């Protein structure tokens, strides 16, 4: 890894520590997904992830899971912006890879599902054949994959094309003017932390982990599974997200709407479950990648 990239990681980590609880959804949500995933890593995965992480991460994947958001506005990384989401036709409430996975210039496979397949393939090629390692930056591949599996579980990262996943829908979150996408990226989690967890992200993560071993325990094997022995299966995750976007995110959230307790209390369980699902599925994907068992990336 280059010295400049190491310096960037160090700077991001220091800022993360200084902010101390006032983090945006990108950091809070992605940290939560990756922290949950770490609890489900198999032994081979723990070793592989620690080997690939930058030294500044100190063996903690969660500490660098927001890196793709930190870099995407820098000119040399702008090409990654379309990889964080996939837009679908307005009001169809469904997702199709061949129809939807492209950037604004119609370059196919440039969307969040395509990115998950791509970075899965990169990590698999290295784990299966050491001769290919020189072709990919595996540290970046790990961080991109971990981040994008988080992104695809946010319903409005698989939203409508016409409103850019809710970014152009202006609403009020209680008294604060914002947009619908930001509500789901940030405001729901922020309000939950203040209302239920004394502004403590570790307490929220602990509560989600408790649900995974209790109320959701029967669902975990289903969340972990991929059809057809695939290593990565983001297409069903995208379909889930657009369905949830239509049923919960867009409903009763037209432009100019004030969203308050009714919206918050009915949508928070959706956000919490998507964070948990993202963590379980990230762990399952990385476990399949780094397992010695035969596998394939899928498509």
UniProtKB/Swiss-Prot annotation:
pH dependence statement: Optimum pH is 8 with RNA and ssDNA as substrates.
Pro-peptide region(s): 284-299
This enzyme's EC code(s): 3.1.30.1
General function of this protein: Endonuclease that can use single-stranded RNA and DNA as substrates. In contradiction with PubMed:23620482, cannot hydrolyze single-stranded DNA and does not cleave mismatches.
Residues noted as binding a divalent metal cation 1 in the record, renumbered to the chain: 69, 84, 147, 151
Pfam families per record: S1-P1_nuclease
Family, per entry: Belongs to the nuclease type I family.
Catalytic reaction annotation: Endonucleolytic cleavage to 5'-phosphomononucleotide and 5'-phosphooligonucleotide end-products
Sites where a glycan is attached: 118, 137, 198, 211, 229
Binding site residues for a divalent metal cation 2: 157, 181, 185
InterPro entries: PLipase_C/P1_nuclease_dom_sf, S1/P1nuclease
Positions annotated to bind a divalent metal cation 3: 25, 30, 151
Organism listed in the record: Arabidopsis thaliana
GO molecular function: endonuclease activity; metal ion binding; nucleic acid binding; RNA endonuclease activity; single-stranded DNA endodeoxyribonuclease activity
Identification of the protein by name: Endonuclease 4
Location of the region described as Substrate binding in the Swiss-Prot/TrEMBL record: 147-196
Quaternary context: Monomer.
Cofactor names: Mn(2+); Ca(2+)
Example GO biological process: DNA catabolic process
